[in-house]
């Protein structure tokens, strides 16, 4: 578990959408430092990083940054990648957490009658981090996460393709040699009906005769 001095940490909550990022930042004592909206693009991300850096420079008692945002489809990926690796913020050891929306939804229940707006959502996410709810989560590792995500999805795609081709082969095999599927393992001529030997024999010989 990462040890962070919460008393000297700036907690940044971001409500992400396709077009904009609504940002709310406060310290452990709930003093507000940022409450603004930025475009969800590179210029907007650069501007946000500049404002966070200026805030850290202005308030010398702050030396660490925790950024929390909900994992919102693909919209949160770029801003999470940028803030976790931004050179301007590196002196302040930024920790970026992409949260399951269910976690913040459950936390919202502790606020009775809170209205549902983008700015209130950003505040809620910031407060979620302030009270230590991110301690059990792992910080964002964008490049590693995306590489693993693409690899696992490609593996699933290949597995589904193989399953589909095997199903197609079995249906054709039944039409050509229906009894092969009914034989016991000891009586089967091939140890693997999907193997190279089986494929070669069944391709070369057009019938049982």
Regions found by a protein language model. Give the residues of each.
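Phosphate- and other anionic-substrate recognition elements at nucleic-acid/protein interfaces
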Residues: 1-209
């Amino acid at each position: 578990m990462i040890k962070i001095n919460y008393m000297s940490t700036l907690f940044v909550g971001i409500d992400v959408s396709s077009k904009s990022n609504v940002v709310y930042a406060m310290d452990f004592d709930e003093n507000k430092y940022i409450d603004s909206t930025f475009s969800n693009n590179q210029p907007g991300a650069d501007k946000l990083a500049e404002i966070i850096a200026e805030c850290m420079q202005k308030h010398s008692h702050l030396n660490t940054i925790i950024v929390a945002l909900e994992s919102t489809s693909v919209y949160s990926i770029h801003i999470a990648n940028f803030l976790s690796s931004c050179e301007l913020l590196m002196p302040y050891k930024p920790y970026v957490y992409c949260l399951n929306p269910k976690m913040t939804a459950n936390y919202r229940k502790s606020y009775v009658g809170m209205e549902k707006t983008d700015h209130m959502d950003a505040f809620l996410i910031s407060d979620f981090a302030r009270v230590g709810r991110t301690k059990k989560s792992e910080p964002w590792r964008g490049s590693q996460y995306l590489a693993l995500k693409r690899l696992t999805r490609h593996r699933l795609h290949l597995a589904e393709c193989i399953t589909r081709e095997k199903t197609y082969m079995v249906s054709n095999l039944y039409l050509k040699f229906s009894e092969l599927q009914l034989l016991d393992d000891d009586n089967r001529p091939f140890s693997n009906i999907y193997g190279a030997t089986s494929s070669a024999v069944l391709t070369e010989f057009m019938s049982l005769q």
